[in-house]
Amino acid sequence: MLRRIVLIATASAAALAAAVPAAGASSLPLPLALLSAPAEDELTVTVSDTARTDGMYELRCGPTGGDHPAAQDACDRLDELALEGKDPFAPVRQDQMCTEQMGGDETARITGTWQGRPVDATFSRTNGCEISRWHTMEPVLPNTRS
């Protein structure tokens, strides 16, 4: 009887030892060579009704490039806002109280990819909150102050 218990225990231990590496092998992470590199940040900035800086500009960050007139400064500003924990493309909250003032007819739209996520943001200068939001995005958006 003792011999039978020892044989069963030995067989069970051997079966368990053989099964554990097989189960663990399927959960191993992928080799680093198979992981993709982070995507370059690519934005299209379209500006209208500014009287002097209307147009469509391409802005690439990481590395800096495109035809944006202040590409390096714009990328630095976006990085600065991200380090502060701010979403530079977030709209003004609907429940936000804003001063009733008109900052001008200028409008802008930014589309593309930033930090791996899609961007589709519009900017205007139709009230105090939107004016502040525009200024926060300078030099990504042009300086409209004289």
Language model features: what each stretch is:
Residues 14, 48, 99-101:
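Residues embedded in well-ordered secondary-structure elements
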Residues 13, 81-82, 141-144:
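Alpha-helix boundary/capping residues
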Residues 26-73, 79:
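Extracytoplasmic low-complexity, Pro/Thr/Ser/Ala/Gly-rich segments
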Residues 95, 99-144:
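Extracytosolic low-complexity repeat regions of secreted or lipid-anchored proteins
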Residues 17, 35-39, 51-53, 67, ...:
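A generic structural signal for short, solvent-exposed coil/turn residues
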